[in-house]
Amino acid sequence: MTIDQLNQDCFCFSLDREALVHALETELGTAGVSEQLKERCASAFAAQPVFVGAEQLQRMAQVVQAVEAIVAMPAHREQVLATAPATARVAAVAAQSVFFGYDFHLDQGRLGLIEINTNAGGAMLNAVLARAQRSCCAAMDSLVPTRASVALFEQRLVDMFRREWRLSRPGARPLATIAIVDEVPAQQYLYPEFLLFQRLFERHGLRAVVADPSELHWRDGQLWHGELAIDLVYNRLTDFYLEQPGSAALREAWLQQGVVLTPHPQAHALYADKRLLALFSDGARLQALGVPEATRQLLLDHVPHTEIVTAAAAERLWAARRGLFFKPVAGYGGRAAYRGDKLTRRVWEEILGGEYVAQAFMLPGERRVEAADSSQAMKFDLRAYAYAGQVQWVAARLYQGQTTNFRTPGGGFAPVYSTVDASGNAFSHYGGEHASYIFLLDDGGAVHPLPHALYVALARQEALAPSLGGQTLRLADWYVRLKDGEPETVVNETYGLYEIDQQGRINVVKAPADAGWPTVAERERMRTLLFADKSTEI
């Protein structure tokens, strides 16, 4: 199967909910974090993975490095910082800034960098999610992240903060205290993640507090939280340039370089201002800046054309709006961003009166998932978490609507599973082919083989089964290794309950995990149908 086919036809669940709770409550978090996350972020985690080819992941890393190469150019830095706020013009900033988020759309193999964030959230949530993955079948065994890889990711997160300290304070004592700062943190949507970070730091011997910026004080050349001197601030504020009154102490500490602040205002100016996307997609400007041809071409191939909205271009942009997406230059989280084909004249006037860019619209990827009531198509984007030009982790975000959100049932962060085959083809395990065999089991003990293609069509609501209407059936999905095109061994069995309405539409029924298990007689009947009385053991 190809990557696109997997994203359309694989309905296997990879998220182990019990393991998720265990990771939140015991392994990474503290008691109560799981319930907080459930209350605040009910759609934080998707149950199914997104499949991405290794070639696309490699190109994402190359785009990250291309952006880094441009930002490192003195001419570019001078040009950008000349008009940036004072907090971005602080000289000799050594910290490189943690948690860059490079957000991509992937549409039928075409990859596009949609935006860059300099305080991307969700990294710890993805660490938790990775700990709760399970392999649904043998074909997935090599794709699910190992405990070792997840532990290494978490260690690298801590090492990243320690490196920020060493870069900013060469020769100083080791990092000791961290403040995780956001405005009214306990009211933030991702507050549970702040607690996970606090616990992560504490497990590695660092004192950590979660604080509102107004709780910080600048005195005696040191930033304080109460009586605790703060070495480093992990900055989750969307007050990117520390302009709000509540950020006054943090602003002064930053201007005086009395605290290590990461991410910091200079990084936002150099990377995240969306006007930079207009530069990255303009070959003439890149050439004038002295960007090498290979880097120019890489960016032109992977950054949708973007331009700054001006009054002079208003008539042309309005006429072309259906192919454009409009974003505020300092926006974040999809706020005040609009698809051009849905624009009203009133909103258009607001765009013209603000600071916006117009980006060529690029479709997000599509992942078909099995939700509570039916199969549905979800959009997805890809977020590459990066530090110092290196990708640390790639996650997907499943959603419905104009922009990414965590309000869609069945949506949220999803793990990215990738093949090692750069061609995008997947699964050649155990030296043979594999196939799924589907059976429906009724209350009378009868077993009905169901062609996999029909099952997919039913799950997608693209087909009906009126002859089965009005029943609740158990569904068995046997993942089978083939030999010479014939079933050889069952390598995984998945069961569930499905309700067929009077029109023949199939819907998932929420039920205990063992509710769909077959009887001994039913299982023997399936074995007979599958192997035609061969003696192969299951």
Go through the PLM ranges and name each one.
Residues M1-I538:
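Preference for protein termini
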